[in-house]
């Protein structure tokens, strides 16, 4: 359960200067407003980050379209972002003004069992920028002392652009997922969904030595976009029986790893039938609450020794690893379809909903 976060303009948490910043504020589902808000002052022990690049995630789209029972309004969305340190508290000695930083959006308690073992994404008291706290669709963000102490700011390698650095969070989520399934060299991976996350999963799987990556997608635009940046087997789910096609590509064995990368994947595809004996099915995407319960053939799990594994979010350390991967040459720029300002953000949500684009980069 997410701890209740700071309300927008909640002066109990921060004091504000008179200078104004722009922010895209979700006032209720379907209503996004560009507001001028006071620039945040630096919290004791914390920092102020000038946000220079943010990416739009499908989770942001879902919040805009349908909201969330735990989301309090008004709220500044955005959890994939990077910028520069604009102000540092006198108590903070590790960071300095001008440092380029990628922001890990989760602030754990730092003391629970999960935080102590490096799984802060599972912290029961986790506060999330762009959900329980205001996020990255603004010109500035004040990060409290707890965020700084828990490693939310990662220094960006000099070889990376800010747009690339802002991609670290979704890339880290893919690293987390493949760590959970313990992907081995030469294994076959089937990825259901050819959007940005599916493409990132494909790139990481190839980088980690997967022998064959099979990407399954229905949308013709996304299939064309994926072809531009990936060297994988692409299946158009409109034109083939996906299970038969996967079996043909794997010599009748199926995939060692199956990954769900969109909300309806478990409803549209026979996940267990795609997996080889001893295979792992990674539930990376959740299922929309209004879709009900998905039936599972537990006998297939038992007799074929299948493993159903969940993965949620990522950790700050995984964001560091993602930055390192990109610095080593993992190319993600091709995923950016469009660059916009905050004023264009609502239109960008509509573009993302129509699947006409991959990643949209916001330059506040």
Regions found by a protein language model. Name each.
Residues 109-192:
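NAD(P)H dinucleotide-binding glycine-rich loop of Rossmann-like/cofactor-binding domains
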Residues 100, 188, 279-280, 307:
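Short glycine-centered segments of the SAM/dcSAM-binding site in methyltransferase folds
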Residues 218-219, 287, 314:
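Residues in the short beta-alpha loop(s) of Rossmann-like NAD(P)-binding domains
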Residues 4-8, 12-13:
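N-terminal amphipathic/hydrophobic targeting modules at extreme N-termini
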Residues 38-54, 67-116, 157-159:
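Glycine-rich beta-strand-centered segment in the early N-terminal region that forms part
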